[in-house]
């Protein structure tokens, strides 16, 4: 059985780590370099760095900060936020990131997935999908620009398309559950896991050990969390000990 991964998210705004609830009410959570080092020490398998306002503000990612964090880490480090071209993605890899993720730019130009996977390798291209459930149709729609713009893309169909175009992994965030700490959106995650063969990272809503157990049992390859680590509710090691007890294969 493949090892399940625990991923810590660093949402960056103005050079600081922040955390919101359902993509709003942002509050400060600390220094990114210090937190990255701490999370690695605490047993996290990967770190995802998201410059949360780069896309909205139409500016480039904070490269100096990426370099600074990359220097300190030995675990895989994925970076995204506002990346629009293959050149920018290559630049971020040169700064020390292991993988890059794209979101809004992939929706606007799906060919970017194809081009980037050819140049930096499919396994280094992650497509992030921010999705929200439509109450009337019960369908999940893709949102872009930090969750501020609704598209008419069905999230499950878009996930399939991303795989076809060469994405190596999907980072799926449910906007309905983000930051609420009441559990991952199992319905959305399962629909996407069943639709694709590439790894799926579930994101949005982790609050306790049971949430990780649930999401791994429906087939997620990795589970991303932010609030529970930032506010010291659990360390990755605590989590993994509990997961191991119920037979989930994790790296201790």
Swiss-Prot record:
| Chief localisation class | cytoplasm
Q: Which CDD domains match?
A: HisF
Q: GO molecular function, one example?
A: lyase activity
Q: Which GO terms describe its cellular component?
A: cytoplasm
Give the gene name: hisF
Record-linked Pfam families: His_biosynth
Q: Which family does it belong to?
A: Belongs to the HisA/HisF family.
**What is the protein's known function?**
IGPS catalyzes the conversion of PRFAR and glutamine to IGP, AICAR and glutamate. The HisF subunit catalyzes the cyclization activity that produces IGP and AICAR from PRFAR using the ammonia provided by the HisH subunit.
The protein here is known as Imidazole glycerol phosphate synthase subunit HisF
